[in-house]
């Protein structure tokens, strides 16, 4: 019950506000500056998201559509909002390109991934309840939730070219700072309430997140000749542990909580080894093929 109270605060207030201000403070020039980076991020990350969804939907007979949707929100999404700067800046330094990668991956994960995941989740719950609804109803229901429409509104804000009011920044930055703490704390409460049991689904989720996603980004970046430094940052961003927001959504909907939290815990531990490994692999590939 305590976790659910925190989840509601995070999903309805803190996270939407944080997502909005993070994206709205970007600009069209930033998105267009490296169009190749933007397109590869969108296509590959969402392809990985849907691969995770279909793998968990059809390879495990006991899984429902809602289970698969939550698994995609967890193992198909890097936790860029919480760990993006914390991981990338110590490795690559504080510069505009780090901010660019974090902003673009954040837009893909939050403005595309979360609404798609919630739509699949709502459709699965409606199907399980035996309701025959319009295929658009789950999408509309997902978009009614602040955590889905706030990042989409922010993207529209950026594309239209409206400058973010400087006088609003301090208030939103305060909420953004509180969101990171609340979200991690809420995810921690959820983790503490669940007995961690390693199973094949948790292991597969970690493999898909830590191996498949960065590997596909690396291959796409090499094929389309991305700038080496940007490619390294994008690969590390893709290798980040699963999104904490996925765990919060799982707990809020009472769906796939145990396996999802186990996969998150396993991925966080394994990331300590996979991060330097992917840096070495990407560096070697860039020297060989770019």
Task: Identify the role of each PLM range.
Residues 1-290:
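Alpha-helical transmembrane segments of multi-pass small-molecule/ion transporters
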């Amino acid at each position: 019950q305590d976790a659910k109270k925190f989840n509601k605060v995070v999903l309805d207030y803190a996270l939407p506000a944080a997502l909005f201000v993070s994206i709205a403070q970007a600009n069209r020039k930033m998105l267009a500056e490296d169009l190749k980076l933007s397109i590869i991020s969108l296509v590959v990350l969402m392809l990985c998201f849907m691969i995770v969804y279909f793998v968990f939907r059809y390879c495990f007979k006991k899984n429902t559509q809602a289970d698969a949707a939550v698994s995609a929100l967890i193992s198909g999404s890097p936790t860029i909002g919480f760990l993006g700067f914390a991981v990338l800046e110590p490795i690559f330094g504080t510069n505009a390109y780090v901010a660019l990668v974090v902003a673009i991956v954040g837009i893909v994960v939050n403005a595309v991934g979360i609404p798609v995941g919630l739509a699949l989740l709502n459709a699965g719950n409606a199907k399980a309840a035996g309701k025959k609804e319009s295929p658009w109803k789950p999408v509309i229901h997902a978009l009614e939730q602040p955590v889905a429409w706030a990042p989409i509104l922010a993207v529209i804000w950026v594309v239209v070219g409206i400058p973010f009011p400087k006088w609003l920044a301090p208030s939103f930055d305060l909420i953004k700072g509180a969101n990171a703490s609340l979200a991690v704390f809420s995810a921690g409460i959820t983790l503490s309430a669940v007995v961690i049991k390693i199973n094949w689904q948790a292991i597969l989720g970690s493999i898909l997140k830590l191996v498949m996603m960065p590997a596909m980004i690396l291959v796409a970046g090499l094929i389309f000749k991305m700038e080496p430094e940007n490619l390294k940052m994008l690969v590390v961003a893709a290798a980040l542990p699963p999104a904490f927001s996925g765990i919060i959504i799982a707990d809020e909907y009472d769906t796939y909580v145990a396996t999802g939290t186990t996969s998150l815990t396993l991925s966080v531990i394994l990331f300590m080894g996979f991060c330097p490994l992917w840096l070495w692999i990407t560096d070697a590939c860039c020297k060989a093929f770019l």
